[in-house]
């Protein structure tokens, strides 16, 4: 599955075996661990097995990981639809874009493409994202993509020193 934005400046596609080095670099970016549920590095082997065992079927895996490619087909980020609940017609979204590719519209275009896919192919009713309130770029990304800040989860994330509040961002399709 490949999805291109209307300006043909970026593409979303399924994770491929040749993405292992890129996935390794993103998953082991310690700055991102605070917004996820990991606190240990992933090995190449573990990530290789993840790629090989993924069916790329959101109904089977309950998640879909997409690689964000720039106009030169270089991987610059990942967009995940996860905690997919077909019965309730919803999923969560997460996105990570390399620092060198941030603030160039790639993230917003990727989110818009994923929303279109969620609406037209998956027939979802809503997508939500949990965003650290201190993560201003991510808050702006989701707000500018049409998500609404509908709730706050107090002390939801812990970085080893401080608890952080999280915005529950929702987009109704």
Regions found by a protein language model. Give the residues of each.
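A short helix-loop-beta-strand connector motif used in the catalytic cores of GNAT acetyltransferases and
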Residues: 54-67
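Secondary-structure boundary/capping residues
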Residues: 32, 60-63, 127
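Conserved GNAT-fold acetyl-CoA-binding loop/helix
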Residues: 31-53
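Short, hydrophobic secondary-structure boundary micro-motifs
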Residues: 34-36, 63, 166
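Acyl-donor (CoA/ACP) binding surface of acyl/acetyltransferases
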Residues: 1-20, 27-29, 70-173
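Solvent-exposed, charged/polar functional surfaces in cytosolic regulatory/catalytic domains
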Residues: 53-54, 117
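Short secondary-structure boundary/capping segments within folded domains
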Residues: 14, 25, 56-58
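Short, solvent-exposed alpha-helical surface patches in well-structured domains
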Residues: 22-25, 49
